[in-house]
Amino acid sequence: MKKLSTYLFLLLFSFQTSSWADDISDFQIEGMSIGDSLLDYFTEKKIKKFFKADYYTNNEYTTIESLQLPSFEVYEYVAVTYYTKDKNYKIQGIVGDIDFPDNIGDCYKEKDKVVEQISELFSNAKKQNRNFKHNYDKTGNSKVNQTSFYLDEGAVAVSCFDWSEEYNDKNYPDGLRVSITTSNLSAWYRNKAYK
């Protein structure tokens, strides 16, 4: 638990922001920001070799998943999303994950702590709490508990994913996720990604 508390402390400071920042690109996850080029971090050859998510039915965006680098201090995994046709690989979304296998209760507790602290950072943002079934699990047994902070240029979300036993068995552990997305990417997730 001490390690997790350290993660959460670092999680908040990994945004590298102040309470006065109102530009979504001011926030970082593991040093990466919205609007950065992936080419600033990886060669094009390396980018093309990364695992690409294949569960979206619409391919307007590409998500590189399961990035794990020795320099990462907070997250077990990082995912980055960019426009599929963008040759500069400009980042449109960043996600950081911490697993809570078989322990969704602790995920909820830690999410509440993170949300409270992020609420202070985004005091002027519109805040929304939601519980919903994950679109990817057609059985409806996988659930998401999410708090979103809406900014002019995008959103920050803190979520606990409670995957069904079937998906846990497919190596989908329950976990905490912090994400930063542009407004366009958020709209794509809502309206096109799974349709």
Segments predicted by a language model, with ranges:
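Sec-dependent N-terminal signal peptides
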Residues: L4-Q16
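Sterically constrained small-residue positions within well-ordered secondary structures
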Residues: L12, S71, K85-K87, K138-G140, ...
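Non-cytosolic coordination micro-motifs
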Residues: W20-T63, G93-K195
